[in-house]
Amino acid sequence: MGITISPWMMAFLILMTGFAGFVDSAAGGGGLISLPAYLFAGLPPHYTYATNKFSAACGTTFATANFFKSGAINVKVGVLAAIGSFAGSALGAHIVLLLSDELLRTMMFLILPVAAVVILWQRDLPDQNRDDGTLNLKKTLLALGIGFGIGLYDGVVGPGTGTFAIIAFTTLMGFDLRTANGNGKVLNLASNYASLFTYLMNGLVVFHIGIPCAVSNILGNLLGSHFALKKGARFIRPMMLVVLVLLLGKLISDAVL
């Protein structure tokens, strides 16, 4: 399909996908910015999702490498979560057509307030790692479960995946925000590639638009991950709240409009 956009719209997309990469690497939720941007630029929905996954996967790859080099990833847990996430995202891509928009919207209205309460009222969201470093059967199953559940969410819904991964890793695995964010990147990377593979096989990625946006997204991810690693909880927590507010606002606007 021959899709063309104006130079001004291309510049707009490059700017927005760069900002999306910054937000996503810091707290997750970059898709909330980039998906509407692609749609606004005139890409059909299927091409929007595919091209967004392409640029997001490229950016997340570099952010994940940044977190890994800084020692902010529990590799064993990250690999297990990635396996679960890949499977969950692949399954989500197949079942999404079975769910109505109303059901998905209702699910999100139930999930977001809970997430907001956890962040707002759990004052001791850890800035120190409470994990003892061991990996037993319980933690193995928990890591696989977190990966599968959030990967499934990413395949079915999408925006906010990284934010929910941070919440899951801090509250369930005992990670500090920095390590939770790093492992969330590994999880999100696997989920992105699971979806991207499907889109590539169907020829839905618009490369002449996606490649410049991918470069911008990479730069945004590198900058955002730098701030997240340097500032830690002081930077990540406010960004998480901003993303949750944006998510809730999008749901309300979708319901009203």
What are these regions (language model features)?
Residues 40, 93, 97, 106, ...:
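Transmembrane helix-loop junction
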